[in-house]
């Protein structure tokens, strides 16, 4: 782990500890000190090789780890086979919804990474977007705003300052115009409740759109990995590691939400923004069976709620408030007036 990584871990851990009651701080796992060899270390610029940085991902299988992805042999296409989903013990949330988790071992600071996975059948659920702003027009959405009727909630898209980035349609009305970017994708829910994707340029005036948002970068487009995620010299930072959040769909239409959490310091410090690279997250989404997927705002913004019927609500909170969120209701629940 490099000196900047240790400093980032310590800074975020202090923020997290500040949100924990004093009586429970003693129960937190202790943070290792910065190795002497790294104290005062200076990061020097280096020439980027054209290929991906060497890394691997392994999944826990009982008491052992099985490597299932290596950067030097990264596939350029995923077929929709959900090999990682085979390792998940699924818990029902509502008809057509389930969630579970897997443990990954990766390179560097991702040596212990938990992945929370949610599956949603859009035919048996209602999807809607939600926003929240203060009187000063600062972004203000967090898990505390999730309506009781919603079974799943997750922050949506990316944001610039206090507004969502790119195209936003709320209940049939355009809230923000489309953004432009070679790796942008639009997640669209039409008036019939169907989910569809628009990768690349988006037209502002579209009939039949109930809810929509844009995000970036595109991870998968009809099974293909975005070419910019296969090289280190294509304009995307393929070295940076962070807590990741992504949304995608399988060929049968199943919606998949995946969030990574730092798994080395216990659940209470899971929001520490250490985790996977963008190419690694693309691989995770491919191995979960998706053929279309996009990254959402991760890091300290990432937040996810799952409300099981008759069981306490599971919350994976973020530190930063966001301007936009996706809510998922059972098909019988109302989505308006939230």
Where are the regions that the model predicts?
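A short, polar/proline- and glycine-enriched secondary-structure boundary/capping micro-motif
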Residues: 138-142, 205-210, 266-274
